[in-house]
Amino acid sequence: MYGKNRTLTHGLLVALSHHLKIKRLVKVKPSINEIVRFLDNQGPFDWAVTMNLKKRHPFYQTYITPQIFEQTGRHYLSLVSKGLFKRQYRYGRAKLNGIFCMELGGLEKRPHLHFAIGSHDKLHKYEILRHLNKAYKKMDWVKGDIHIAPYQDSGWLNYFLKTGFSSVVFH
């Protein structure tokens, strides 16, 4: 075993060698309020962004999948961070705080992503807004306009969770 598995196994063996007794494992299902509180603690967030995606890519003749959803969301946050922080982002020293939610829905609904993005105090709001729009124009799977608004409160996170917590991705 290598990497994290080795450390996890080693930690488990150490715990067992100290005669720790685990009575039973309980599967806990958190409430919506607990999940919203957890997501809110990942902030602070300054921007609420929604972007529509294509159901089918016109050139590659492929339909959107959850993997493409996630890659598109991560790519967008990465482009915005690269534009704002340049080398600091490339070397892992600075990035925007962000979470996003994938919403696919039925055949009649357009797939889209919802973002909650936090920014640093050192950055001007105009500069961040410019990079949010600029990164959107470089995206491959997007369709239509982007909707960018100031993040108001955790009500946006409640809206995130309407399709379930499994659709939320941290960046």
Model feature map: region roles:
Residues D40, R90-G92, G105-E108:
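Short, conserved, surface-exposed binding loops centered on an aromatic residue
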Residues M1-G3, T9-H10:
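Nuclease-adjacent, charged terminal/linker segments that flank catalytic cores
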Residues G43-W47, A94-L96, K109-L113:
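Residues at beta-strand starts and edge strands
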Residues G11, A15-A48, R56-G73, S119-H171:
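Catalytic "initiation/cleavage/transfer" segments centered on a nucleophilic residue
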Residues P66-C101:
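Surface-exposed, low-hydrophobicity interaction/linker segments
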Residues G98-D121:
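Histidine-centered divalent-metal-coordination microenvironment in nucleic-acid enzymes
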